[in-house]
Amino acid sequence: MNLSFLIFLSVLQGVTELFPVSSLGHTLLVPALFGMHIDKHAPQLLPFLVALHLGTAFALLWYFRKRWCALVRGFFASFGGRRNDDAHMMWALIIGTIPAGLVGLLLEKRLERIFHDLRIVAIALIVNGVLLWFGDRLQRTRAHQAPEKLTFRQAFFVGLAQIGALIPGFSRSGLTMIAGNAAGLTAEKAAEFSFLLGTPIIFAAGVLELPKLFHAPGQLADALLGGVLTAIAAYLSVRFLMRYFEGRGRLASFGVYCVIAGIVFLGWFLLHPQPV
């Protein structure tokens, strides 16, 4: 892979994976818009993208390292009968991870077909933007609660939202933030829960695809470099986003971007059909 293209793709992935704008959608749409060819049929494409996802997962683990240590301690303490907010939160994350994990394993091959029609991806990005706008309005009309106080049913509901992000164009972080808002979380707490919830899914997807990466000739070096670049971009992104939502940042801003970008992408690919 060309070095400049590798750097571009890695940074794009690291930023858009955490911003609620669909990383996979942008990874497919942006290069095509600028004439950067991605062979969607290449067997090494998905493993390479997953290597970038691993970089994101490590960035999230490092940023929330103190939080994860407390959650893990609370989880093991719960087996001894000592339940606290950290234990409750950890069990909520486990329950929330189940839906997307199961659906991803069962429908992975069928969902890959959507990658081949960029018009569908662009439409999904527009819908994602509309959902973010409604989610922002919803967040401002709900009573707020701490993420540790989410019921397990609410955590499962937030986890269900991740399923939509298996379709390129829909954002995992965006959909889970919207679901968190619906459950009564503040924008800041919904973002934190979303990032914590996404970490095991992103990490597990990478681990499952690693065998394909090792069997792709010449891809290991590219993947390692891409993973490091993505990790740096993702760390800077999560730090920015947490501060953004702490400062009363709004999902609606990202919703407007997704709608405008989706319309631009859709118009371009309708006028310039891409080979599938």
UniProtKB/Swiss-Prot annotation:
Catalysed reactions, semicolon-separated: di-trans,octa-cis-undecaprenyl diphosphate + H2O = di-trans,octa-cis-undecaprenyl phosphate + phosphate + H(+)
Annotated membrane topology: Multi-pass membrane protein
TM spans (from-to): 5-27, 44-64, 87-107, 114-134, 150-170, 190-210, 218-238, 251-271
GO molecular function: undecaprenyl-diphosphatase activity
A Pfam match: BacA
Keywords assigned: Antibiotic resistance, Cell inner membrane, Cell membrane, Cell shape, Cell wall biogenesis/degradation, Hydrolase, Membrane, Peptidoglycan synthesis, Transmembrane, Transmembrane helix
E.C. no: 3.6.1.27
UniProt keyword annotation of Endoplasmic reticulum present: no
Record's GO cellular component terms: plasma membrane
Role noted for this protein: Catalyzes the dephosphorylation of undecaprenyl diphosphate (UPP). Confers resistance to bacitracin.
Protein name as annotated: Undecaprenyl-diphosphatase 2
Organism field: Paraburkholderia xenovorans (strain LB400)
